[in-house]
Amino acid sequence: MLNEFKEFIARGNVMDLAVGVIIGAAFSKIVDSVVNDLVMPVVGALTGGGFDFSDYFLPLSGNVTAQTLAAAREQGAVFAYGNFITVFINFLILAWIIFLLIKLVNRARASVEREKAPEPAAPPPQDILLLSEIRDLLKQRA
């Protein structure tokens, strides 16, 4: 069973998938940093809400008087929409970057295909040539 597992892991597609997951996780951290460190402070400043959306919430209970989300959750029910805004912007940026990457790959692939000169058609096999000659000779006799 251990040998089967080694064979499974050693296959190319499993290794490619593992590399893709690792690169995806690292890329996700980069996008998180772009959103949290670059985009959200600008959006927060433009909306007049400061630089941090994580403490944006609506109290659902009259007992909630706290100013931070953590303290408000201890006091009662809250509708914490600030983190959702951050995650949604993160998703939009990630989706846009993936779209641009796929567009770039498709453009490069199309460019390579256009550069390829069409290969001349291979001559028909010898047996096809002989059969064609026989057919032509039979047509002439008829």
From Swiss-Prot:
One of its GO terms (molecular function) is mechanosensitive monoatomic ion channel activity. It is a multi-pass membrane protein. GO terms for cellular component: plasma membrane. The chain crosses the membrane at residues 14-34, 82-102. Keywords: Cell inner membrane, Cell membrane, Ion channel, Ion transport, Membrane, Transmembrane, Transmembrane helix, Transport. Its main location: membrane. It is found in: Cell inner membrane. Signal peptide: none annotated. Belongs to the MscL family. Homopentamer. Channel that opens in response to stretch forces in the membrane lipid bilayer. May participate in the regulation of osmotic pressure changes within the cell. This is Large-conductance mechanosensitive channel.
